[in-house]
């Protein structure tokens, strides 16, 4: 019994610490008027508190979330080279090597964090105690599948959109509005009330910037 409680306390402390750091960074970004979004912060602190107190019900929830985030970030990392043209990756590295490397390092850190949380909460003492207490102790297969699907499906849809008529039209309009001096990479598209709105990345050797175009269907 003591061993499983020690594992929960260890994971709880890490989650609380990570959540507090994330909240502090969120406050900093708000004060600097920078955009920032995260899946951790408050949820990590709350989950950490429950685990620290030895809640086996929280074990199932946090394990599911860790499995989902692990598969999500691993899928993102694997698909990363294919999400942008090689030339755009090269331009990003040349213009902001530190920012790009920090972004990749953050993704790797998140993968390692969620892997550690998952393996800790799937350790034999925790699984055994959860099962004996009547809580679910099965592998969260759906969480893994959902994490992969939420990366692969949108990426696949965007790939086909770029190669379709709508993608070509978005690039054509962007060239008209923002000039021929840029190359354009489609990053998002939405349809509403007969209008189409597309988000693109415009880039050349000197700069990279986000642009938007809109047209009627």
Model-based region annotation:
Residues 1-217:
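Topology signature of small-to-medium multi-pass alpha-helical membrane proteins
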